[in-house]
Amino acid sequence: MQEQKNLLIAEGGLGDFLQFLPFMLANKPNRPRYLVLVHFKGVQDLFKKFGIKVERFVTYTLDDEKAKKWKELNVTEAFSQVPRTWFFEENPFKPQKPVFNNGKKTIGIHLNGSKNSLDTRIKQGKPPKELPPKIVEDLSDYNILLFGLPEEVQATGLKQSDTVKFITYLDIYQSLSYVAQCDAMVASDSSIKSMSSMLKIPTFLWMGDNEDYWRDLYFVDPYVKAGVMKTFRYVFAAEDREYQRGLQLTKEYLNDVLST
C-alpha cells in the first residue's frame, strides 16, 4: 500500500500564491497534497491554469472568517507550510503582445490593495492601501499601464489615451502577464507589486506607516535588501503634503532606475 504524502498548507492572498508558485510548479511531478486557504477567489482559476492539483480549497473574506473555517476543517494530521521563493527564475506567465511601441519607457501603476486588505486595515484603524489617482497624470512623461479591477479603475474617472492603457481583466492570469512589459512599477501594497518584484522589475512601493510583521518579512524586506524595491511610508497618501513628498520620491526613483 502506498504511503500517504504529508499535507502542505498554502494560505493567504494572491501575493502569497505567487511566492508559492515556483515550488508548486517544480514539484508538479510529485503531486503533493495541498490544502489551500485563500482570500482571493481568482487564485482557484490560477491553480487550474497551471495544472496544480489541490486536495481542498477554502476561500474566506476576512481573517476572523479564516480562523473559523480553519477550526471547522479540524486538521489532525501533521502538515507543513508550502515553501516560499522570492524571485522567479523564469516568468511563468505567458507574455502578451506589447501594448506600446513608441519608444518611451513604460511604468505600471496599481492604486489599490485587495478588498480583504482594505477592509481589514479600516477595521484596524491603519492607513489604507490606496494611491491618489492623480499620480497617473503626474507621471505622464511615461507610458502607463494602469492595473486594477474594472470597477476600481472606472471609479477613478481616468481615461485611456495613446500613453495610458488599462489592464483590468477579470482573468487575473491575463492581468499578471502584462507586468513583464513594465520597465518599473509604482504600486500600493498589492499582488501587482509582488509580481513585479519577483520579476526583478524596479518597484516603488507606497505603503502605510504602520507595523506589519508579515508584510515586511515576506513582501518588503527581501526585495529592499536585494535592491529591487524602494519604499515610501505614509499615514494618509491623499493629504497634499504627504502626496507631494511621495510623488517627488517616486519621480527621483524612476529617473534613477530608468535613466540607464
Identify the function of each model-found stretch:
Residues 17-18, 130-209, 213, 219:
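Donor-binding and catalytic core of enzymes assembling or modifying cell-surface/extracellular glycoconjugates
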Residues 1-81, 174-177, 187, 192-195, ...:
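Active-site and donor-binding regions of nucleotide-sugar-utilizing enzymes
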Residues 3-6, 104-105, 142:
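Nucleotide donor/acceptor-binding cores
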Residues 9-10, 110-112, 147, 206:
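Short hydrophobic segments within beta-strands
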Residues 20-29, 114-146:
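Conserved catalytic-core segment of nucleotide-activated headgroup transferases in glycan assembly
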Residues 8, 15, 106, 170, ...:
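Catalytic phosphate/metal-binding cores of nucleic-acid and nucleotide-processing enzymes, i.e., regions
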Residues 60-106, 113, 117, 256:
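A nucleotide-sugar donor-handling region in carbohydrate enzymes
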